[in-house]
Amino acid sequence: MAIFKDIAGLRQWRQSLHGTLALVPTMGNLHEGHLALVRLAANRAEHVLVSIYVNPLQFGPGEDFANYPRTLDQDLQRLHEAGCQTVFTPDDGLMYPRGRQDISIVMPPRSLSKVLCGASRPGHFAGVCTVLSKLLHMVAPEILILGEKDYQQLRIVQQMVADLNLNVQVLPGPLQREADGLAYSSRNIYLNLAERQVAPLLAETLFDLARRSTNDAAVSDLAATGWERLERAGFLPEYLELRDAQTLQSLALPQPGARWFAAARLGQIRLIDNVIIS
């Protein structure tokens, strides 16, 4: 396995390649959701590069940057077993050599970034756009693989790529779930046993709302029912909303292809999920 920690070695390797390259950016602590993205990349490109970097720029004050799980040796083993042969593991000194307080920032489109997670995490998506812009310039892939679990992030990056005329195709990877329906997340390991037993109710609630989202259903009534269900189970909901899948504008009435989005805390852990109306 080739592991690059500097830009010079990475670019030398990149220039030697023949054929398409897919980039799968991650923050490590890899799980089956990440590995599914790696497999998707291998099916769509002749070469795959996985980046592992916990980006401090996308964490706000009081968030879990210091405690975010860092499991590099385990991640490399999982990638090796999945057939991935090339990994980029930059550090803060490489990504932000002058520090993080006075750097050029890539601002996300306002209409997509001020709602949902952006409403409670100011600066988060600017951090995401900045680090992904840097990675795209360093790696120069033909394909960028992003999961639909972070659907708002996916839409923001798709729009950023279009707005900045970046020469890369953004390819979505379907959201992956554990056997009981809970969306895979690196933060799931922080759930205690009791919380882990309750956690799948977030997905159950969204799937139930999607099934009940008929043409004449009132979104406000559906959302209120789902919100109450989550609260009864011990969640502290942050949002539960039906939005257009492209514009992320809120909807008063269901429509095919729209998505239900939810964020809720269970104990100290913030969970997010989304389900499409089929």
Swiss-Prot record:
SUPFAM superfamilies: Nucleotidylyl transferase. GO terms for biological process: pantothenate biosynthetic process. Pathway: Cofactor biosynthesis; (R)-pantothenate biosynthesis; (R)-pantothenate from (R)-pantoate and beta-alanine: step 1/1. Homodimer. PANTHER family: CYTIDYLATE KINASE/PANTOATE-BETA-ALANINE LIGASE (PTHR21299), PANTOATE--BETA-ALANINE LIGASE (PTHR21299:SF1). Belongs to the pantothenate synthetase family. This is Pantothenate synthetase. The gene is panC.
